[in-house]
Amino acid sequence: MEYLDILNNINEEDQEIKLKPHDRVLIIDGLNLFFRNFATINLTNNNGAHIGGLGGFLRSMGTLINKVQPTSIYVIFDGKGSTVNRNNINPDYKANRNINRITNWDSFDSLEDEHESKLDQLQRLVQYLKLLPIKILSFDKAEADDIISVLCNQLSYDKNKLFIVS
């Protein structure tokens, strides 16, 4: 399974935005928070498998919820083909990104093992997030930051307090 397959499993139903004036809205760039935790938290489960991305994301989200006390939470993921538009404008967009290991410890024997763990954790994260009372948004050909921008413009008119984590 690849990253885009995981995102395709995000239900696009029930993504209507229903807020009341003065709501406190927490908006999280899902991949950004996931990758930061995956790369920096060397957390393993009882079987010795790396779960830093998953565990770190959930721990970070819990901390954010305690601090912000949101009435609504949105986790935004890059959509399928999200870099296409920017690559059309600038062919060098993200061109310098190499496929390298992003962790600096020995939890993985190879780049392939790290990649497999990353996809497994991301898939489980999306499954867990679907069980929570939050909205998960991902739209084809749109990057998370673009979706967040549109969402903020849409939500700000009712004097909602918006908290963005990216």
Placement of each model-derived feature along the sequence:
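Catalytic core of IPPT-family isopentenyl/dimethylallyl transferases
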Residues: 12-13
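Noncatalytic, basic helical substrate-engagement surface that gates or grips nucleic-acid strands
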Residues: 2-7, 17-165
